[in-house]
Design a protein with these regions (language model features):
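Charged, amphipathic alpha-helical coiled-coil/dimerization segments
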Residues: 4-8, 87-144
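N-terminal helix-turn-helix DNA-binding core of bacterial DNA-binding proteins
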Residues: 37-78
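N-terminal positioning helix adjacent to the helix-turn-helix/winged-helix DNA-binding module
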Residues: 21, 52-53, 114
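N-terminal leader segment of winged-helix/HTH proteins
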Residues: 1-47, 94, 111
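C-terminal regulatory/oligomerization modules of transcriptional regulators
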Residues: 1-17, 128, 139-160
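Generic structural concept
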Residues: 26, 30, 57, 112, ...
């Protein structure tokens, strides 16, 4: 197995950056994603919600008052796809739209109280799993993990 082109200050390859170790990490990301998706799909009514809907609701939950273009950018989906998701969620009263106080052409998006409670219920097992893993790992590991994730996401944004 080859090493990726990273060396520590002394010039020798960093063992955790061997290609096989990086591939193992990638496989772990895939497995975690699959497990989280399964937990969510087991808890939702698939006639109403899909993973895209839950992700949309989560982003609005984290950013109350977010506007359409910001949500579209965060989800990295087309205008047409987001319109389809939002139309359904607004029609079923999961999302509340309010006219933006600074620009009447824009609408701020919020979750209803019922939707916030439902989302908390759906995500509770995942949040508990993540919290438990963070507690077992210690603060340095949590900071390192978050730094890795943020570096991956920043690189993706820079490549776009």
């Amino acid at each position: 197995m080859s090493d990726l082109n990273f060396n520590n200050p002394k010039g020798s390859p960093l063992l955790y950056l061997r290609e096989d170790k990086v591939k193992e990490s990638l496989n772990t990301f895939f497995n975690v994603s699959k497990n989280f998706e399964k937990i969510i799909t087991d808890k939702i009514n698939n006639d109403i919600f899909g993973i895209a809907d839950i992700r949309c609701l989560l982003i609005i939950n984290l950013n109350p008052g977010i506007i359409f273009n910001e949500l579209m950018e965060e989800l990295d989906i087309s205008k047409q796809s987001l319109n389809r998701v939002l139309k359904k969620l607004i029609h079923n009263n999961f999302i509340i739209q309010k006219i933006n106080s600074e620009d009447a052409r824009k609408k701020n998006l919020y979750l209803s109280n019922q939707t916030n409670k439902m989302l908390d219920n759906i995500l509770e097992p995942i949040l508990n799993d993540i919290s438990e893993a963070f507690q077992k790992s210690g603060s340095n590991s949590v900071q390192g993990f978050n730094q890795i994730i943020n570096n991956i996401l920043k690189r993706k944004k820079n490549d776009s």
